[in-house]
């Protein structure tokens, strides 16, 4: 099978946004216009093609990023629909890693919302070029230029409209194309009656003003165009398009377009923009990797001629074919039935079949080429973030880093039969989702599951019931507290046991000090003159690491600490690794009285959107939850309160907000950072953990 679409004509894009901005509907319409779907499914009727898990259809939100392939004007567009709900940030991180470009969907009424900021930040981290699609222009309160303003204010992004809407709300019936200087008028809401016309007289002035601004903004990033512009020469449509494309692919400029996916307006023009302005795999820098043995940095270019290299970015369990591994091919070609090396794990894998996915149906293909996104059946050891490559030309592509879970609950099966199934279910689910963890608490024997938020864990429990038929009881949520030291001190740990025959002896002096936030644990060996023999030094580090898991105040993990081994002594016969391990953990316990240990708690960035009249109640409520209000602003006819609130105080907030605002308020929260717990709260936590 030869290559159907050239690399230049391939686009790998993600569709990202805040919850409810209309991403899934936009993706649906793209699939519809590119001939992949015969009937359109509406998200709010629960029949969308991309949302194929039952819970997604029930809740009307997208949880797993379905990858699907579409064709438009001789190009192949691979689309990954990502969830906008904050608990599923990992899905977004994962898909951005393998994309070349993205479409950020905004709601024309609200503009940039909190989750948009999070996703935008992630896209900036991975250097992903973006187009902004201001959706829902048919909604009451839709305001295109306000939305563009929020991109400048909240994202500090160099974004400029390349289109303007004609009318808004019920009157939204056309789009002005500032690049081609024409307009498209819609005769109905089905997207079937579109007419290309001249820009209507009453909109000409505004269109000229914004076209001028657009040319100026693009010229600033392109010297040749700047010269022409300053000399007053005409800039052709082709030159302007090339300028926008160059500036967009180098992530210096973000074109903004508008439409209403629900009313089938602007979707075809969105597809044109994806092809005109977003990069092909050839336009983005070659992916970097390292050689497994030497850690030497190498590049893999987007080309079929290079050795095969791909990144697995998602694992899914499929009821019919078992485990599906979604991967992005960066270089080379892969045939089904062939063997590859998983260089991250050092394992050989056989690729049984290769499937090209369309939201929930699939077609089997025999070969994938550089730039493709597909799913493999038959991989046994591969997990998210692993590199698959040619056995003769090994490389490890840069992997992805995932955030630590911030919330955990105890879970127990309802019956003995559920007990065994639960183990299988949890291991499969944690294979699919790196931010979900399951472990057994050594002291209580309970199974603990941990994740990124209440909704995340709700959905995990729900999936256990549906997909694995496991019924389980869930305990109250627990916060993932941490502990750390605030002061430095030098402490001694000495372990000596003499009981006939061979004894045990280990003796260390360790200097503990606070580390920078987020730096974790750092161990340094400062021993001179061999007072502690070299072979015991790793044991001291290991002893400390083991003890860090259960902190000194209330048993929470100790983080962000430096430890330096500065002195000690040993015994020729009685010293052993074990003895030094124990001595190190004794030193850590002794540090409690000297290093001023404190408890840290996860702080959430909360944004509450409410009608004006509830402002007082909500501010009072935030303060009563130990929250700090960080800012307020009017958004349309609603008020937005931004605050930093401890996660422990946010449980059940959705219910409280509903009753405080008669169901008219909404909120979103994202994990922001860890912060020291006030003394009174800290005492409560310690008491509770000691079972007093």
UniProtKB/Swiss-Prot annotation:
Q: Where in the cell is it found?
A: Cytoplasm
Tell me which UniProt keywords the record has, alphabetically.
Answer: Cytoplasm, Elongation factor, GTP-binding, Nucleotide-binding, Protein biosynthesis
Keyword Cytoplasm assigned: yes
tr-type G domain location: 8-282
What Pfam families does the annotation carry?
EFG_C, EFG_III, EFG_IV, GTP_EFTU, GTP_EFTU_D2
Any single GO molecular-function term of the entry would be: GTP binding
Under PANTHER family, the record lists: RIBOSOME-RELEASING FACTOR 2, MITOCHONDRIAL, TRANSLATION ELONGATION FACTOR G-RELATED
Q: What is this protein called?
A: Elongation factor G
Instruction: Give the originating organism.
Output: Bacillus cereus (strain G9842)
The top of its lineage is:
Bacteria, Bacillati, Bacillota, Bacilli, Bacillales
Q: Which gene encodes it?
A: fusA
């Amino acid at each position: 099978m030869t290559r159907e679409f050239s690399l230049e004509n391939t686009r790998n894009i993600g569709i990202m946004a805040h919850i409810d901005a209309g991403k899934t509907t936009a993706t649906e319409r793209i699939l519809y216009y590119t001939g992949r779907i015969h009937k359109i499914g509406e998200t709010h009727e629960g029949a969308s093609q991309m949302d194929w898990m039952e819970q997604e259809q029930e809740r009307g939100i997208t949880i797993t990023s379905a990858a699907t392939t579409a064709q438009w004007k001789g190009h192949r567009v691979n689309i990954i629909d990502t969830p906008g709900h904050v608990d599923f940030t990992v899905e977004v991180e994962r898909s951005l890693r393998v994309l070349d470009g993205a479409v950020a969907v905004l709601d024309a009424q609200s503009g940039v919302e909190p989750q948009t900021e999070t996703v935008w930040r992630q896209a900036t981290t991975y250097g992903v070029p973006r187009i902004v699609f201001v959706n829902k222009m048919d909604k009451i309160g839709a305001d295109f230029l306000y939305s563009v303003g929020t991109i400048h204010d909240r994202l500090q992004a160099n974004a400029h409209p390349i289109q303007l809407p004609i009318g808004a709300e019920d009157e939204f019936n056309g789009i002005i194309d500032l690049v081609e200087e024409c307009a498209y008028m819609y005769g109905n809401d089905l997207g079937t009656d579109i007419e290309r016309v001249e820009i209507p007289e009453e909109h000409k002035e505004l269109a000229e003003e914004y076209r001028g601004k657009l040319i100026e903004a693009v010229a600033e990033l392109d010297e040749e165009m700047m010269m022409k512009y300053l000399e007053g020469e005409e800039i052709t449509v082709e030159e302007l398009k090339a300028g926008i494309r160059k500036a967009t692919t180098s992530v210096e400029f973000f074109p903004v377009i508008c439409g209403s996916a629900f009313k089938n307006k602007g979707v075809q023009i969105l597809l044109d923009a994806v092809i005109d302005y977003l990069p092909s795999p050839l336009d983005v820098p070659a992916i970097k990797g390292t050689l497994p043995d030497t850690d030497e940095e190498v590049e893999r270019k987007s080309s079929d001629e290079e050795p095969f290299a791909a990144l697995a970015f998602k694992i899914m369990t499929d009821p019919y074919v078992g485990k599906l591994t979604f991967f992005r091919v960066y270089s080379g070609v892969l045939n089904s039935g062939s063997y590859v090396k998983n260089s991250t794990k050092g394992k050989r894998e056989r690729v049984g079949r290769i499937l090209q996915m369309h939201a929930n149906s699939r077609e089997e293909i025999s070969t994938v080429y550089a730039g493709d996104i597909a799913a493999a059946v038959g991989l046994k050891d591969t997990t998210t973030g692993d590199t698959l490559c040619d056995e003769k030309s090994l490389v490890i592509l840069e992997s992805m880093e995932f955030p630590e879970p911030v919330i955990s609950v105890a879970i127990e099966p309802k019956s003995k039969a559920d007990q065994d199934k639960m183990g299988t279910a949890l291991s499969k689910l944690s294979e699919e989702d790196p931010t979900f963890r399951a472990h057994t608490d050594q002291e209580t024997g309970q199974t603990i599951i941990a994740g990124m938020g209440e909704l995340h864990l709700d959905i995990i429990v729900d999936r256990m019931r549906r997909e694995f038929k496991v019924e389980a009881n869930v305990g109250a949520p627990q916060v993932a507290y941490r502990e750390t030291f605030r002061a430095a001190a030098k402490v001694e740990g000495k372990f000596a046991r003499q009981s006939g025959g061979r004894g045990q002896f280990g003796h260390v002096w360790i200097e503990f000090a606070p580390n920078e936030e987020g730096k974790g644990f750092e161990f340094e060996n400062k021993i001179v003159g061999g007072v502690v023999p070299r072979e015991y030094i790793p044991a001291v580090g290991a002893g400390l690491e083991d003890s860090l898991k259960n902190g000194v105040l209330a048993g929470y993990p100790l983080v962000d600490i430096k430890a330096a081994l500065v002195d000690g002594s040993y015994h020729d016969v009685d010293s052993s690794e074990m003895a030094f391990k124990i001595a190190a953990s004794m030193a850590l316990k002794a540090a409690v009285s000297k290093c001023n240990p404190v408890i840290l708690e996860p702080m959430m960035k909360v944004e509450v959107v409410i009608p004006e009249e509830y402002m007082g109640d909500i501010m009072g409520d935030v303060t009563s939850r130990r929250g700090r209000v960080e800012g307020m602003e009017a958004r349309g006819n609603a008020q937005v309160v931004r605050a930093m609130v401890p996660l422990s105080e946010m449980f059940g907030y959705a219910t409280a907000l509903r009753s405080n605002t008669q169901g008219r308020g909404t909120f979103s929260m994202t994990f922001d950072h860890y912060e020291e717990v006030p003394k009174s709260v800290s005492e409560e936590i310690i008491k509770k953990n000691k079972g007093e």
